């Protein structure tokens, strides 16, 4: 009988002890720890640039004067993009919110220095490039000003199987090939801020099936299970229904407490390079053994 592979070696490499390994960890922080450790191990090897080439994109933060030819800007790398859920109904809404332009005028004019002085200006962020593998962090946990505490945002937020990232790129971006991305991973959080559980839906091949990975259980999944069941939002109730008991919290709620927390998209023009077939030689011998 086949057994699930132990994660002990992985968590030990993060410096976690047994107690930390069994605590609920934030999946975005875990992803960053994994990337950091892999980068450390790859330094000085032929694979040193492999991770940045796969996962790193670039943003430009800018302040551009409206009436004179002056712009202040800086280019920065990103490994993932944090997108607001609250106030945005779709993934496209969240991207538009991210690159929304602020106008600096009146008492809030921008000081462009000599010889221009105070100027009306546009301030914002735009993407210079997206990586072949794009990690999107949906901000499901936020500080609630009314409750004065961190709360989970269970609002409905729709994400597509495919989306075009071109509208969010700067005018100078390379448009020689398509910027359409296809969904290949959905990391779900079920529960509340204090009590919950993570599981994942993954499509490991270009044209294959979706699978649900939940602790040591792996099952085939439908597109409905991948998409609609993880948008969050209100349940559809029959008349008189007061709510549904939520897993982990055991409280009744009119909103789904299971919803997407991270999304993994792969650029379609690069999918053949990213999703290479995995052979037995690629799997370490001690992991490939079955009992």
Q: What feature does the model see in each segment?
A:
Residues 1-77, 113-116, 128:
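Papain-like cysteine protease catalytic cores
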Residues 1, 43-46, 69-291:
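Exposed substrate/partner-binding surface patches
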């Amino acid at each position: 009988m086949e057994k699930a592979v132990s994660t002990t070696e992985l968590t030990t490499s993060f410096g976690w002890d047994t107690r930390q390994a069994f605590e609920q960890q934030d999946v975005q922080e875990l992803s960053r720890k994994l990337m950091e450790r892999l980068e450390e191990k790859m330094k000085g090897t032929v694979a040193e640039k492999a991770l940045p080439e796969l996962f790193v994109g670039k943003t430009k933060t800018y302040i551009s004067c409206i009436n004179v030819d002056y712009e202040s800007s800086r280019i920065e790398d990103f490994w993932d993009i944090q997108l607001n859920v609250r106030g945005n109904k779709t993934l496209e809404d969240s991207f538009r919110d991210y690159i929304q332009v602020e106008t600096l005028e009146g008492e809030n004019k921008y000081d462009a220095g000599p010889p221009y002085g105070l100027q009306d200006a546009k301030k914002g962020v735009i993407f210079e490039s997206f990586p072949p593998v794009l990690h999107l962090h949906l901000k499901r946990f936020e500080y609630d000003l009314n409750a004065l505490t961190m709360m989970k945002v269970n609002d409905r937020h729709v994400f597509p199987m495919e989306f075009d990232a071109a509208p969010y790129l700067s005018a100078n971006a390379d448009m020689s090939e398509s910027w359409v991305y296809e969904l290949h991973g959905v990391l779900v959080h079920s529960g509340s801020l204090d009590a919950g559980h993570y599981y994942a839906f993954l499509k490991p091949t270009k044209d294959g099936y979706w699978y649900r990975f939940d602790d040591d259980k792996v099952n085939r999944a439908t597109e409905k299970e991948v998409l609609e069941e993880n948008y969050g939002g209100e349940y559809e109730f029959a008349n008189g229904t007061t709510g549904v008991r939520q897993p982990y919290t055991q409280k009744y709620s009119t909103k789904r407490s299971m919803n997407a927390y991270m999304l993994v998209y792969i650029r379609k023009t690069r999918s053949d390079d990213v999703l290479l077939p995995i052979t037995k030689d690629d799997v370490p011998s001690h992991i490939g053994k079955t009992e």
